[in-house]
From Swiss-Prot:
Sites where the protein binds Cu(+) 2: 122, 125
EC number annotated for this UniProt entry: 7.2.2.8
Family note: Belongs to the cation transport ATPase (P-type) (TC 3.A.3) family. Type IB subfamily.
Main location (coarse class): membrane
Gene responsible for this protein: HMA4
Subcellular location: Vacuole membrane
GO CC term, one of those recorded: vacuolar membrane
PANTHER family: COPPER-TRANSPORTING ATPASE HMA4 (PTHR46594:SF2), P-TYPE CATION-TRANSPORTING ATPASE (PTHR46594)
Induction or repression: Induced by copper in roots, but not in shoots.
Annotated keywords: ATP-binding, Copper, Ion transport, Membrane, Metal-binding, Nucleotide-binding, Repeat, Translocase, Transmembrane, Transmembrane helix, Transport, Vacuole
UniProt cross-references to CDD domains, sorted A to Z: HMA, P-type_ATPase_Cu-like
Phylogenetic classification of the source organism: Eukaryota, Viridiplantae, Streptophyta, Embryophyta, Tracheophyta
Name of the protein described by the UniProt record: Copper-transporting ATPase HMA4
Species per Swiss-Prot/TrEMBL record: Oryza sativa subsp. japonica (Rice)
Region of interest (Disordered), residue spans: 1-35
GO function term, MF aspect, one: P-type monovalent copper transporter activity
Length: 978
């Protein structure tokens, strides 16, 4: 669909000059070298900033060096260079030439790839893949997720390659397909048109590699497709398409269109499901007749007489038919178990395939022995067990089929997230004055940074951006979990994947591709599902000796029953008809082999973590892996920051006081000039108040005075040189640091302000306090209820703030927090956390990310609240998309529910094996006459894995705690503040 525009692939420059859509590809400057490397040096002897500057100056002057950064505090130098023109040794010698000692260099060129792993069934399998990857030279780090069936590998591309990594996995007996290469960078996949030879593709590749902003180009000559990794700050997919078009020389014509390869994970999952289903159905085609010929028809006349008819000596028609029908099941359909067992034993470990292969082979080859013995003897009579082998394989395949179907549902939440973004967007073409002159519907993947798009009511927001025109309400529940639509006006951010409710808005694109909030959420959840929870170590330890123990137990079971039968320790009537003591013992031994299930143990943790992280993401709670999920359930104390955490984080100046003859506007101008470079909410409040004050005085200028020598004093305030004056803006501690006298009048005003639960910000000019600004930041409406609910969960709440004691105590009293630490700087917050940890408490820290990084990192569990679109917060273990304290409760409650589910899974998996193996070994047989036939034992084994996965799937029914939902449904402030 197109309106007043041309085909967007033929003419990608849809914005007119000055419209802000991006630069022409013709104007993109080609680069001399595409590839760069980064190296880090540990440099000793750096004592000051001037040392760092001297190193940077010398190294930057070397040929081929693109950038250099020296950290005096860490004693490190990071240099990015072009390997064709420079090398690490030359750079090291240059630094040593300045009389600095340089340690051995550490190359930082690490590549990343994600692989789909096929054939993993239990923890032993995932450990085998991980060991195989770690043994590959050049592999730095490898993480394998059993439930996700993926691996993420960090490797040195100078030593190994993706092909060698895949080959190592295949040598270990598993399949591997490349999902993606690169560490989640922006890429576009294009299908080439008009290409007639490999030379054409090479020409296109060279042209693309010369474009500024292109990081890598991968070509598939056979499929005529190309993958381009690019920097969205410099270029974009439409510019790349035009570059391809411009590469053609008449009469040739090149074009490119977006290519969407099949979603590999879903395709592999569906293929695996179809494969197991087909194998099960084929096995039933043979196993059911074997079962009928063995168990049912011999009891029905005249079928019984026919089946017992002797063909040669004592070999009957029934024996021959069962042998012929069972063999395809054993060696064709069951071949996968032989392959899996071979590769496992080859690598020095054992898995479920080993148990299945041993059990079915024992039944099959003993049955073959019986048939051959009957064929060659006129007096021998024996009973074959072909139905055991055939039915066992069929039931195991049925269990695997049900298991992969259930496992596929564990990633439903993640799949729904990936499908939120719309396929198309309405791109506007603007004139020089910013007015829309045409609009064109294009693929969302073709959007570039700074594009301007139109979103009408009911449409999904395609990518992250900022509203530049129009007003509306946007439903963000699918991303943040916020139940109510959020009001949006010019200047507000919108998130890709959310739904525009009732107004038409014009949005400027700010983030595309892998940089969007939705993509970051998906990446974070995928990484979390790859990470192992500490509780998984229990299954890992058990899996190492599980199968050998089962094999020994099965042998001892057979030996015990066989010896007991030979020496008549039990009555002969215990032995079923048509069996002898050896055959009865063999049945018990095979049952023990196949009833044991290591898969259920291996799936207990990863499936629960996978469902929980996906469920949390759908509610705006992003949990960074099983470690954070497990630690959160142990939390006994939570430390809250005040500003932006307990309060709404939108402080405003509500009162001013001048202590000198300086005009109020001049005082505020100087304070705003000093605060303009700070990101703290109080600083923004002062700057905003100054702008409004100017309007009251008749000035409409937004200009803020420039400052020099700006410095942040953590927990105290800021200092700067504004208009030649030393301006200090902060609390009492800042004034004391600069030895500024504080009069009794100032002290009195501070006390009055703090009694009203306001923050008193002092402004000193040239070491004289000239005024004070009273800043109020209202409490979040749910704060009191959230603190009360945490208390009911057995969690104590503590407030640690850099604000004054009076304000802190007033806020704490209002929300119900009993323990308060005030006037604490960011480092002090981390120290308070360590003090609590020394007392044996598991401590969580909740902060808004501003000045809270040390505390978030020091806490056992760091929760960054109100992340919004900024979900890549490194210091936090759990990222909360909204600013609501109810999500803190949701995170901890979800953690507790998940750990309870994992424990239940372990109880079931361990209990099943602990109880199932003795029953299979025949402990009930002497008392009740009940025994577990091998085929039924196999069915029980298959059911155990399915039951564990289904148990984990129950986490999809998780709902927020009742009281918290009541808070969410209650009245709220301005939606912009919540």
């Amino acid at each position: 669909m197109e309106q007043n525009g041309e085909n967007h692939l033929k003419d990608p420059l849809l914005q007119a000059d000055g419209g802000g859509s991006g630069a022409s590809p013709a104007g993109a400057s080609p680069r001399k070298e595409r590839k760069t490397r980064k190296v880090m040096f540990n440099v000793r002897g750096i004592s000051c900033a001037s040392c760092a500057v001297s190193i940077e100056t010398v190294v930057a002057g070397l040929k081929g060096v693109e950038s250099v950064s020296v950290s005096p505090l860490q004693g490190q130098a990071v240099v990015q260079y072009r390997p064709e023109e420079a090398d690490a040794r030359t750079i090291k010698e240059a630094i040593e030439g300045l009389n600095f000692e340089v340690d051995e260099l550490q190359e930082q060129e690490i590549a990343v790839c994600r692989l789909q792993i096929k054939g993993m069934a239990c923890t032993s399998c995932s450990e085998s893949v991980e060991r195989a990857l770690q043994m590959v030279p050049g592999v730095k780090k490898a993480a394998v997720g059993l439930a996700l069936e993926e691996a993420k590998v960090h490797f040195d591309p100078n030593i190994t390659s993706r092909d060698l990594i895949i080959e190592a996995i295949e040598d270990a007996g598993f399949g591997a397909d490349l999902i993606s290469s690169g560490d989640d960078v922006n890429k576009v996949h294009l299908k080439l048109e008009g290409v007639s030879s490999p030379e054409d593709i090479k020409l296109i590749q060279s042209r693309l590699e010369s474009v500024e902003g292109v990081n890598n180009v991968e070509c598939d000559t056979a499929g005529q497709t190309i993958i381009v990794a690019y920097d969205p700050d410099v270029t974009g997919p439409r510019l790349l398409i035009q570059c391809i078009q411009d590469a053609a020389q008449p009469p040739k014509y090149f074009n490119a269109s977006l290519y969407s390869p099949p979603k590999q994970r879903e395709a592999e999952r569906h293929h695996e499901i179809r494969n197991y289903r087909n194998q099960f159905l084929w096995s039933c085609l043979f196993s059911v007749p074997v079962f009928m010929f063995s168990m049912v028809l011999p009891m029905i006349s005249p079928f019984g007489d026919w089946l017992f008819y002797k063909v040669c000596n004592n070999m009957t028609i029934g024996m021959l038919l069962r042998w012929l029908l069972c063999s395809p099941v054993q060696f064709i359909i069951g071949w996968r178990f032989y392959v899996g067992a071979y590769h496992a034993l080859k690598r020095g470990y054992s898995n479920m395939d080993v148990l299945v292969a041993l059990g079915t082979n024992a039944a099959y080859f003993y049955s073959v022995y019986i048939v051959l013995k009957a064929l060659t003897s006129e007096s021998f009579e024996g009973q074959d067990f072909f139905e055991t082998s055939a039915m066992l394989i069929s039931f195991i395949l049925l269990g695997k089929y049900l298991e992969v179907v259930a496992k596929g549902k564990t990633s439903d939440a993640l799949s729904k997230l990936t499908e939120l973004a719309p396929e198309t967007a309405c791109l506007l073409t603007l004139d020089k004055d910013g007015n829309a002159i045409s609009e064109t519907e294009i693929s969302t993947q073709l959007l570039q940074r700074n594009d301007v798009i139109k979103i009408v009511p009911g449409e999904k927001v395609p990518v992250d951006g900022v509203v530049i025109k129009g007003q509306s309400h946007v439903n963000e529940s699918m991303i943040t979990g916020e139940a109510r639509p959020i009001a949006k006006k010019p200047g507000d951010k919108v998130i890709g994947g959310t739904v525009n409710d009732n107004g038409c808005i014009i949005v400027k694109v700010t983030h595309v591709g892998s940089e969007t909030a939705l993509s970051q959420i998906v990446q974070l959840v995928e990484a979390a599902q790859l990470a192992r929870a500490p509780v998984q170590k229990l299954a890992d330890r058990i899996s190492r000796f599980f199968v050998p123990t089962v094999v020994v137990a099965a042998f001892l079971t057979w030996l015990g029953w066989f010896v007991a039968g030979q020496f008549d320790i039990y009555p002969r009537e215990w032995i079923p008809k048509a069996m002898d003591s050896f055959e009865l013992a063999l049945q018990f031994g095979i049952s023990v082999l196949v009833v044991a299930c290591p898969c259920a143990l291996g799936l207990a943790t990863p499936t629960a973590v996978m469902v929980a992280t996906g469920k949390g993401a759908s509610q705006g709670v992003l949990i960074k892996g099983g470690n954070a999920l497990e630690k959160a359930h142990k939390v006994k104390a939570i430390i809250f920051d005040k500003t932006g955490t307990l309060t709404v984080g939108k402080p405003s100046v509500v009162q001013t006081k001048v202590f000198s003859k300086i005009p109020l506007l001049e005082l505020c101008d100087l304070a705003a000039g000093a605060e303009a470079n700070s990101e703290h909410p109080l600083s923004k409040a002062i700057v905003e108040y100054t702008k409004k004050l100017r309007e009251q005085y008749g000035s409409h200028s937004d200009h803020i005075m420039e400052s020099k020598d700006f410095e942040v004093h953590p927990g105290a305030g800021v200092s700067a040189n504004v208009e030649g004056k030393l301006v200090l803006v902060g609390n009492k501690r800042l004034m004391q640091e600069f030895e500024v006298p504080i009069s009794s009048e100032v002290e009195g005003h501070m006390s009055e302000t703090e009694e009203l639960a306001r923050t008193c910000v002092l402004v000193a000019i040239d070491r004289t306090i000239c005024g004070a600004l009273s800043v109020s930041d209202p409490l979040k409406p749910e704060a009191g209820r959230a603190i009360s609910y945490l208390s009911s969960m057995g969690i104590s709440s503590i407030m640690v703030t850099g604000d004054n004691w009076a304000t802190a105590k007033s806020i704490a009293k209002e929300v119900g927090i009993g323990t308060v630490f005030a006037e604490i700087d960011p480092v002090g917050k981390a120290e308070k956390i360590k003090d609590l940890q020394m007392k044996g408490l598991t401590v969580a820290m909740v902060g808004d990310g501003i000045n809270d990084s040390p505390a978030l990192a020091a806490a056992d569990v760091g929760l960054a609240i109100g992340a919004g679109t900024d979900v890549a917060i490194e210091a936090a273990d759990i990222v909360l998309m909204r600013s609501s304290l109810e999500d803190v409760i949701t995170a901890i409650d979800l953690s507790r529910k998940t750990l309870s589910r994992i424990r239940l899974n372990y109880v079931w998996a361990l209990g099943y094996n602990v109880l199932g193996m003795p029953v299979a070994a025949g402990v009930l047989f002497p008392f009740t006459g009940i025994r577990l036939p091998p085929w039924l034992a196999g069915a029980c084994m298959a059911a155990s894995s399915v039951s564990v996965v289904c148990s984990s799937l129950l986490l999809q029914l998780y709902k927020k705690p009742l009281h918290v939902e009541e808070v969410a449904a209650g009245p709220k402030n301005d939606p912009d503040l919540v």
